[in-house]
Amino acid sequence: MTGKLIWLVGPSGSGKDSLLEALRKQEHPQMLVAHRYITRPAGAGCENHVALSEHEFFTRAAQHLFALSWHANNLYYGVGMEIDLWLHAGLDVVVNGSRAHLPQAKARYGESLLPVCLQVSPDILRQRLEQRGRENALEIAQRLERAARYTPQQCVMLNNDGSLLQSVEMFLHLIRTHGNHKESQHACL
């Protein structure tokens, strides 16, 4: 493979969907943002995804149409085999990944994988979760606890406390400069 698979992870509320949407709006001829296939209705949440029923999802999985797939938060997620074609064509591909399933991505893509972890301070994360209004107070507390205890190893860290424009610029800078370094890297704004 000649392209990089950028596996973007981070806690709920860290700004992954906003970052991906901003990347889609810019012109990057050598980079594509992959859509995930999710067993969630099209209008639910903020993510631009392909909505599938569980039956459709399992039919595609049985036909080996997903490069990667996982189950989380009572939903099934998949990334289509098309990403392998894009990578072989030399394109970099950004995927809204899963922190817990980073080992699965590493096993499949090896040195072609660039894991990037969005991090935000606890106060900013709490504020964002409260503003979006999808979780109650208990669910917010659980998400904050999960975010504090789980940080993937060997990821390039990107602080997302600043503006969306700053985060997009730093994300693109990380992709250009860090490549597939094995050691953990940190980028702060």
UniProtKB/Swiss-Prot annotation:
Disulfide bonds: none annotated. Pathway: Metabolic intermediate biosynthesis; 5-phospho-alpha-D-ribose 1-diphosphate biosynthesis; 5-phospho-alpha-D-ribose 1-diphosphate from D-ribose 5-phosphate (route II): step 3/3. Its EC number is 2.7.4.23. One of its GO terms (molecular function) is ATP binding. ATP binds at G10, P11, S12, G13, S14, G15, K16, D17. Pfam families: AAA_18 (PF13238). InterPro entries: GK/Ca_channel_bsu (IPR008145), P-loop_NTPase (IPR027417), PhnN (IPR012699). Keywords: ATP-binding, Nucleotide-binding, Transferase. It comes from the Bacteria. Belongs to the ribose 1,5-bisphosphokinase family. HAMAP family: PhnN. Catalyzes the phosphorylation of ribose 1,5-bisphosphate to 5-phospho-D-ribosyl alpha-1-diphosphate (PRPP). This is Ribose 1,5-bisphosphate phosphokinase PhnN. It comes from Enterobacter lignolyticus (strain SCF1). The gene is phnN.
